Amino acid sequence: MLKLIIPTVMLLPLTWLSKTHMIWINTTTHSLIISFIPLLFLNQTNSNLSSYSLLFSSDPLSTPLLMLTTWLLPLMIMASQHHLSNEPPSRKKLYLSMLISLQISLIMTFTATELIMFYILFETTLIPTLIIITRWGNQPERLNAGTYFLFYTLVGSLPLLIALTHTHNTLGSLNIMLLTLTARELTDSWSNSLMWLAYTMAFMMKMPLYGVHLWLPKAHVEAPIAGSMVLAAVLLKLGGYGMMRLTIILDPLTKHMAYPFLVLSLWGMIMTSSICLRQTDLKSLIAYSSVSHMALVVAAILIQTPWSFTGATTLMIAHGLTSSLLFCLANSNYERTHSRIMILSQGLQTLLPLMALWWLLASLTNLALPPTINLLGELSVLMAMFSWSNITILLTGLNMLITALYSLYMFITTQRGTPSHHINNMKPSSTRENTLMLMHLFPILLLSLNPSIIAGLTY
């Protein structure tokens, strides 16, 4: 694992030692090279974690998430260039250092084998994200958003720490490899049910589950572009990853406990999709669509069949790339119109025709058009849900319909119509932006050729 962690750590001195005009080139190039390292971890056997060391190892569940995390750093750096253009060099370097330290802690979180280690790193990701939101956000409300983000995450994860120490006392170890061998089956007693709640609540707040999702739209709307990208693409996936990892400890109690949470996530999926139809704020719409997609992942993980796990992993990767792409597009609109209101940026297709193509492709991937991996993930989850209970097909089918509606509503509102009067002079789309959009779409299209590499543990 050090062959991934050490080069990423070395990005920090690289950032601070680069000359002012070379900061962007150096960091982007090096982080792009680093993003190819996780490809070495593919094609592993399913039965064991590839044990690189006692503390860090990877398996078919963490490798796709590592690929996503590392691929996102050069994209975040490319996306941030414009809004940092007026900052002094030291401020730029500090910003990049925050992104890199966030990347390091995320890589270590996804590869940690010791659960206490995983918990500490899971909490560490909070600090750089909080600094990025509260220091580089646009509006004064960013402080409020930061408070929400901090307290939701901390309140959720304190019971997790207590539950982990309890498990450590009873089983004597928290190593994932050992737990597969030693974990005992939980009975459905009151104390065990509380422990199950303590374990899953932290991750459900991170996902976020409908009901504890209020921090997400706030954080997304106020964050700068790189903050939004990493929040949507990777930080939400920490919740799903943690829930999948802890199934070993919580089995078979999940079957007793999952029912209310399944209902809540299905209901929340419909509610948040419906909220999207009434949104005027572009970033808020994409944030709520993230909640509705992740609700599907929560439901899939709680069902706990091999098929639903495959669907959940695929959907997490697909959603990470798609929502990050949508935030980039929203940001490119914001940099030109200086407003997040969709109606004010209508008619942009006539002014930026190539951007309209990216918007169309992004909207279509968001509504899970075949042959994208979004569709594969949603279909796997849909089939798993249907075999669990036939009635769920009504809710999930309705959700797919509403998703298609708000994706096309978003596309039509921002691109079609007559341009507003305040858009007289507008910068054309730069090569940097077009490359950025292409680098989001490229993995989505390539993975649809061989989706088995992101299908997770059970494939």
Curated annotation (Swiss-Prot):
Bilayer topology term: Multi-pass membrane protein
Phylogenetic placement of the source organism: Eukaryota, Metazoa, Chordata, Craniata, Vertebrata
Cellular component, GO annotation: mitochondrial inner membrane
EC code: 7.1.1.2
GO molecular function: NADH dehydrogenase (ubiquinone) activity; ubiquinone binding
Disulfide bonds: none
Alphabetic keyword roster: Electron transport, Membrane, Mitochondrion, Mitochondrion inner membrane, NAD, Respiratory chain, Translocase, Transmembrane, Transmembrane helix, Transport, Ubiquinone
Catalytic reactions on record: a ubiquinone + NADH + 5 H(+)(in) = a ubiquinol + NAD(+) + 4 H(+)(out)
Location of this chain's protein in the cell: Mitochondrion inner membrane
Protein name: NADH-ubiquinone oxidoreductase chain 4
Function, in words: Core subunit of the mitochondrial membrane respiratory chain NADH dehydrogenase (Complex I) which catalyzes electron transfer from NADH through the respiratory chain, using ubiquinone as an electron acceptor. Essential for the catalytic activity and assembly of complex I.
Subunit structure of this chain's protein: Core subunit of respiratory chain NADH dehydrogenase (Complex I) which is composed of 45 different subunits.
NCBIfam families in alphabetical order: NDH_I_M
Gene name in the database record: MT-ND4
GO BP terms, alphabetized: electron transport coupled proton transport; mitochondrial electron transport, NADH to ubiquinone; mitochondrial respiratory chain complex I assembly
Entry annotated with the keyword Electron transport: yes
Family stated for the protein in its record: Belongs to the complex I subunit 4 family.
